[in-house]
Amino acid sequence: NFVVIFTDDQGYGDMSCNGHPTIHTPNLDRMAHQGQKWTQFYSSAPVCTPSRAALMTGRLPVRSGMASSKRVVLFPDSAGGLPQSEITVAEVLKDAGYKTAMVGKWHMGHLPRHLPITQGFDSYYGIPYSNDMDRDPSVKGNWVTTGKTSPWSVYRVPLLRNAEEIERPVNQSTITRRYTQEAVKFIKDNKENPFFLYLAHSMPHIPLYRSKKFEGKSLNGIYGDVISEIDWSVGQVLNTLRKQKLDKKTIVLFTSDNGPWEVFKTHG
């Protein structure tokens, strides 16, 4: 089995196993201690859409048309997406008999013909693009100018199940927890089958949100809280694999998509 856990804009030093003094990540530390820790690694692009296209296809994003000198990432008004002609890792594994699921941020085309279920995934649960998109223009001030987070309802980001919109705007303060629940359910439901799970968290891309359970969890403000919740999520996945006796036959990879963005006060 294969589990790929992908975070959005997380920095190399945002984990205690990489030396952060105030953000504690015991589950990621366990992965680093018990597994392999890769410290030299290239991302194919510094932004979301092309780096994800490269992950899914193993090809430079310019070869799949998922890179541009003008609009480097896809937006809610974009008509394009990852071409059907591209072969994804999900398609390869599905053809080999694997059950496949994508949970989280896709950002390779939000129209039905470009969603994960057309690219080799049996199921999809998540948001189709970045969590800061489709912002209500009537609301003034945001994390860039104030360092504070606007209510999640300001960002009219949809939550999809397969190709159906089930919530809009999605409650982003619960999204990490719900992604985790969906991932755990998929593992349990497919414990008798070989599977590929792609869990792509929306966080810690700004704006930042975390559940009430993790408010004040870190000494490093809301950014630290968000990383703490992601670490909890990793622990839930690892513990589920162990309880289902799948840990010895599952490869788990954790990585950020392309590293951190700019400096936004308490937002990373």
Spans of features found by a protein language model:
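Formylglycine-dependent sulfatase
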Residues: 1-268
